[in-house]
């Protein structure tokens, strides 16, 4: 998916495969949830002032990746309401987190937080370092990104049973707009 901000900043995030070196379980029904389901995530980011970086890292479990689409859809829908509360989603690996804050009706500030192996190369890397990439986006653009992300995730079905229902921990919602 690609999300572009009004100020020229952008982020592209997509799954590019299962974590290398981890074979699928012989019996998916008996395997512990998650271990074989790490996805290699490719990130390409650009700040508003033109600094760029990219990386590949096994950052999300399949179920987390699928749940992200529902979360993004939910944020787009909430932005249509009068005063949606700020929201955040974190994952098992601390490389990525996302926050939203309503700016005005149907406009959001989406903060993509990078940490650990996902930090930009120009940052020092103490264990607690976080780099926030702020993106100002419309609810419609966030819906498009959620649909793109869901499409990317279809190529990577779970290889073990999930802790969540098929559509993830959040109910699938209709498109905003």
What do the predicted segments below correspond to?
Residues 37-80:
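Short, well-structured hydrophobic secondary-structure segments
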Residues 4-6, 14-16, 44-48, 63, ...:
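A structural detector for beta-sheet-dominated domains
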Residues 24-25, 33-39, 88-124:
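Intrinsic, low-complexity N-terminal interaction/targeting segments
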Residues 54-58, 82-85, 128-131, 135:
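Alpha-helical rod/repeat scaffolding segments in eukaryotic adaptors/tethers
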Residues 74-98, 155-177:
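Short glycine-rich, low-complexity/disordered patches
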